[in-house]
Amino acid sequence: MRKPGNSTSNGAALAPAGRLLLHLAPGLRQAIDPDDIFFVEATGDDTRVRTRAARALRDVRPLGEIEPLLLRRGFLRTHRNYLVNARHIRQVRRRPAGEDWELKLDPPVNRVLPVSRGAVAALWAAFGED
């Protein structure tokens, strides 16, 4: 019998205490606290998960399969290839070329990631701006 709160509507498993199970390889799972994730990047058929410890973990699932698990935990889809933990966004700025936007993440990651034009409104809304 399934315990309440241990799976999502799409059947993906949640680890205890709100942790996320990364699928590192077939038959190998690792629990991680979503707050420790800075961003998730699509890399072909799988996904790269960048953590607070500045490690990159590989999840064998595509980004679209992980997305619903993270959107309800404060992550934003900022680009077709990226989900970003809003709690780790340090700065949002226009790109030097003009119209497009980018964001910079907190240390120790300090990565600069693109923000697609279609994601700008949702980004401002997440921070309570118009």
State where each predicted segment sits:
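Mature exported/compartmentalized surface modules and terminal targeting/interaction regions
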Residues: R2-K3, W124-D130
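Conserved binding/recognition cores within well-folded domains
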Residues: R2-V112
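Structured alpha-helical
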Residues: G118
